[in-house]
């Protein structure tokens, strides 16, 4: 007789995991491991970190995957190390060296002036090896296929580009910096452009994301820590409360939402969370033509 199958592991509760991604893993690698740790296929990630980068990566579990496309993650902060003296095919340390330049006479003041030019509202050409789509195909896929890629500049905002330290080495200069920027900004492109401005070439040596939207490293856990204690960083109610404006409903209005009925507009900008009198989230909603329209229903099926 065949042995009976082990009981199926119950699905985890819905919510967010704030992961401190290690270097060398893709964002999809992190999702795959989180699926195993949490015992569910229903895991997704918001935003992407390059394999060389570390730091904050937001994962949705179970019904919380519905939140991922609506999270306001348009402001991000990084700790970066820029290497001046060589440019690479990928604008980071993983690419092949394209050019080298003399850094012996570059001064700290010149570096500060170059950084200032890259602060504020700027036009940035994304890195050629990036996920930007050109005629429906990712730029990195075109590069790997041997195509010459020309990506148009696009507007981004660099809110902060603060130099923390400068080290003059024998054949290059390393710059440690804090970069706070809008979504779509490539920090490795900042390194490339700083090196180009100084006439020596530049690339990104190291990158650590410390914040994305309202989520910070202070709440992040490593994958090894999650293995030991596979618990959510934020349950579904706490996740919505942390990431969206909140609208609390009385019992009658909450009942109307549960039955798919329209309720009056909230007078709030953008997407907000609808919470019942018990503090549980019912849906994400947005005002539209005088009513509150559900954008994502978060009630269990």
Where are these regions (language model features)?
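Accessory RNA 3′-end/elbow-binding domains used by RNA modification enzymes
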Residues: 1-45, 49, 53, 115, ...
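The conserved catalytic core of RNA pseudouridine synthases
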Residues: 36, 58, 148-191, 196-198
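Glycine/acidic-rich beta-strand-loop module
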Residues: 42-72, 141
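Residue-level signal for inorganic ion chemistry
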Residues: 59, 80, 136, 190, ...
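Acidic, low-complexity central loop/insert segments
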Residues: 64, 69-126
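Short, conserved beta-turn/loop elements at beta-strand boundaries and strand-helix junctions
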Residues: 88, 120, 152, 166-170, ...
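Short, structured loop/turn "capping" segments at alpha-beta junctions
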Residues: 121-126, 188, 200-206
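Extended alpha-helical targeting/anchoring segments
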Residues: 130, 134-158
């Amino acid at each position: 007789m065949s042995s009976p199958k082990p009981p199926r592991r119950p699905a985890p509760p819905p919510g967010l995991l704030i992961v401190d991604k290690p270097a060398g893993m893709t964002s999809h690698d992190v999702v795959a491991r989180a699926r195993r740790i949490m015992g569910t296929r229903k895991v997704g990630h918001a935003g992407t970190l390059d394999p060389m980068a570390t730091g904050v990566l937001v994962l949705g579990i179970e019904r919380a995957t519905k939140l991922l496309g609506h999270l306001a993650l348009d402001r991000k902060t990084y700790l970066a190390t820029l290497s001046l003296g060589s440019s690479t095919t990928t604008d980071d340390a993983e690419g092949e060296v394209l050019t080298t330049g003399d850094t012996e006479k570059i001064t700290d003041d010149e570096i500060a002036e170059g950084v200032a030019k890259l602060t504020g509202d700027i036009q940035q050409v994304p890195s050629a090896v990036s996920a930007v789509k050109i005629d429906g195909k990712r730029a990195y896929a075109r590069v790997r296929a041997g195509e010459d890629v020309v990506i148009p500049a696009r507007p981004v905002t660099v809110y902060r580009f603060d130099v923390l330290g400068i080290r003059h080495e024998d054949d290059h200069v390393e710059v440690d910096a804090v970069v706070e920027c809008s979504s779509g900004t490539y920090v490795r492109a900042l390194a490339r452009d700083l090196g180009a401005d100084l006439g020596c070439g530049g690339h990104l040596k190291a990158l650590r994301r410390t914040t994305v939207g309202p989520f910070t490293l202070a709440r992040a856990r490593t994958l090894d820590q999650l293995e030991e204690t596979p618990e959510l960083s934020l349950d579904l109610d706490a996740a919505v409360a942390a990431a969206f404006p909140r609208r609390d409903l009385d019992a009658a209005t909450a009942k109307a939402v549960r039955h798919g009925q329209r309720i009056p507009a909230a007078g709030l900008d953008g997407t907000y969370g609808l919470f019942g009198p018990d503090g549980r989230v019912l849906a994400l909603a947005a005002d539209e033509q005088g009513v509150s329209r559900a954008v994502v229903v978060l009630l269990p099926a």
